[in-house]
Amino acid sequence: MNNTAFSKLAETTIVYIVDKIEEQDLEGIIDVDLQGDILNLDTENGIYVINTQSASKEIWLSSPVSGPHHFFYEQGKWKSRIGFELMVLLTEELGIRFDKYEIF
């Protein structure tokens, strides 16, 4: 994947995460702050940071629950080297339903 394709895919993914949270978090429990390619989610469990790493073509997640993760895009999914999927992990930790195939 070239840099342009990665940037577009990563941006689409982060915007998708923001949209799903805003759609489902009707009580405003999660404070969403998107600045460029850095997304901060302030939750009852702590602050999540999601950002893109163009050089490695990865999305990085810092979770107050499960720690740091690096995700690469493969076969329609953002996966970590140890087998986690980004959308599945966010669903489990945030309680927001992310259809992992919806944006692809």
UniProtKB/Swiss-Prot annotation:
GO cellular component, one term: cytoplasm
Functional summary from the UniProt entry: Involved in iron-sulfur (Fe-S) cluster assembly. May act as a regulator of Fe-S biogenesis.
Keywords for the protein's UniProt record, in alphabetical order: Iron, Metal-binding
Key word Endoplasmic reticulum present: no
Record gene name: cyaY
Protein's UniProt keywords contain Iron: yes
NCBIfam families noted in UniProt: FeS_CyaY (TIGR03421)
Family the entry assigns: Belongs to the frataxin family.
GO-annotated biological processes: intracellular iron ion homeostasis; iron-sulfur cluster assembly
GO molecular function: 2 iron, 2 sulfur cluster binding; ferric iron binding; ferrous iron binding; ferroxidase activity; iron chaperone activity
Protein name stated in the entry: Iron-sulfur cluster assembly protein CyaY
Organism: Rickettsia prowazekii (strain Madrid E)
InterPro entries for this protein: CyaY, Frataxin/CyaY, Frataxin/CyaY_sf, Frataxin_CS
